[in-house]
């Protein structure tokens, strides 16, 4: 089974969270950035609030839980930034029955390093095998499928 997520490149150096959410909901990164980026950067909007505003059903995790990447769906993950010293970076990992796929929104920006699934970066100078990350939230494949097909979604608990 191929991934449901379509890669989008973040249009500015600090828009990885908004771009990851845009990939999840199938909207343009620029639209989501215009709608949510500044309040998020200012600390007036949390990732949880962003997910809820977008109607995304998810399971949240504490970094102490260290959940395995076993269930099919999309994992919203925080990893160390490869391009901003001391910074964090948001990526997506989609798990399907045929493996896992890493979607790094910085991929494609000039001279920016980006994460790839282990063993997939060989010979690509800017591609770095993904090592450490923390799972922030998990979205079931069924929820993504329903969103994309226009099926009615179950009400999201606040």
Locate predicted features:
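Generic serine detector
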Residues: 2, 15-18, 28, 62-63, ...
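Extended aliphatic helical segments
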Residues: 5, 17, 25, 74, ...
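Active-site nucleophile-adjacent alpha helix/oxyanion-hole segment immediately C-terminal to the catalytic cysteine
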Residues: 1-56, 152-158
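Generic alpha-helical secondary structure signal
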Residues: 18, 79, 118-119, 137, ...
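Conserved active-site-adjacent core of cysteine acyl-enzyme catalytic domains
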Residues: 31-129
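Contiguous, function-dense segments enriched for cysteine-driven chemistry
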Residues: 1, 70, 134-137
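Hydrophobic transmembrane signal anchors and adjacent membrane-proximal interface regions, especially
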Residues: 3, 114-117, 142, 146
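Charged phosphate-binding loop/patch that engages nucleotide di/tri-phosphates or the phosphate backbone
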Residues: 123-158
């Amino acid at each position: 089974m191929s991934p449901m997520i379509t890669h989008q490149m973040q249009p500015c150096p600090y828009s990885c969270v908004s771009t990851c959410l845009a990939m999840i909901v199938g909207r343009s990164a620029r639209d989501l950035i215009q709608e949510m980026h500044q309040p998020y950067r200012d600390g007036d909007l949390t990732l949880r609030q962003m997910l809820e505003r977008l109607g995304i059903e998810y399971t949240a995790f504490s970094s102490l839980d260290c959940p395995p990447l076993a269930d099919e769906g999309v994992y919203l993950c925080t990893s160390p930034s490869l391009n901003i010293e001391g910074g964090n970076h948001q990526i997506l990992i989609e798990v399907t029955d045929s493996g896992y796929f890493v979607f790094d929104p910085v991929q494609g920006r000039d001279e920016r390093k980006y994460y790839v699934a282990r063993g997939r970066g060989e010979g690509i100078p800017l591609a770095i095998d993904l090592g450490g990350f923390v799972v922030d939230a998990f979205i079931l494949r069924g929820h993504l499928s329903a969103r994309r097909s226009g099926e009615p979604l179950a009400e999201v608990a606040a």
